[in-house]
Amino acid sequence: LPRHCRGPTLRHPSDVSKSMARVIIDGRSCDVAAGETILDAARGAGIDIPTLCWYPKLPTVGNCRICLVSVEGERKLLPACATPATDGMVVTTESHAAVENRRAVLSLLLERYPTDEIPADAGRNEFEALVHRYDVPRTRSGALPLRTGDERPTDPIITHDMSTCILCTRCVRACEDIQVVGVLEVAQRGEHAEIIVGADGNPEHAGCTWCGECVRVCPTGAIHDILPMAKLRAGTLSAPATTVRSVCPYCAVGCQLDLEVHAG
């Protein structure tokens, strides 16, 4: 038959099985495609491995170390976000070593976080939710100062409060790899590291399009919309009267938006 008349190429069942891996995660058998990570396998099975620097569609950097898990036969913990799931692998996500590692990581991050603002009963964001989940003391030794400063002081739409930034770099990677704008970057190193907006701190000069991608991916709310967040923190933001599906007018892609309508 001519090439355009041929049907789809059928794969032998053995070829399909070779492209799959069967792993055991917390006692549950999971079949995953070759090349997928432990995190992919776990999420596909509904098993929650905590993450902070990892985010869907972003390049994996594995720098927060919150997703480390125990793998049978390995002497050290492995990052679930960056470790390929191989056939026969046995993974424990909440082993004593993994949990203690998460508590240690969260404690270190709390050293540069305003712990007195964390609610006693629940977290306001992803990071605080993990602090509660692993029952980490909400205290600071005071050895390191809080990060300070609004990186967008003249921005009428977005506030970037460094005091709650944990340097996960989600915002930097989202701006660079999803929006392909590259407005944000990490400046300096060590305890002096911070996220900056362009060379002079002016988002307009840096080419910001105010798409809101950095707001969406931030796990602590360090980057947030000005008006809604102020009301949310004050407890005065009412539930939306309705939600309207619309289309973003910025470019020709036609991304759909869900707009929350408050007070008419």
Where are these regions (language model features)?
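N-terminal cofactor/phosphate-binding cores enriched in small/glycine residues
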Residues: 30-87, 101
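Generic start-of-chain signal for non-secretory N-termini
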Residues: 11-35, 227-230
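Short strand-turn-strand beta-turns centered on an Asx-Gly dipeptide
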Residues: 25-28, 72-73, 262
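Fe-S ferredoxin-like electron-transfer domains
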Residues: 65, 74-210, 215-216, 220-247, ...
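Short beta-strand elements
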Residues: 69, 257-261
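Conserved catalytic-core segments of large NTP-driven translation/proteostasis enzymes
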Residues: 245-255
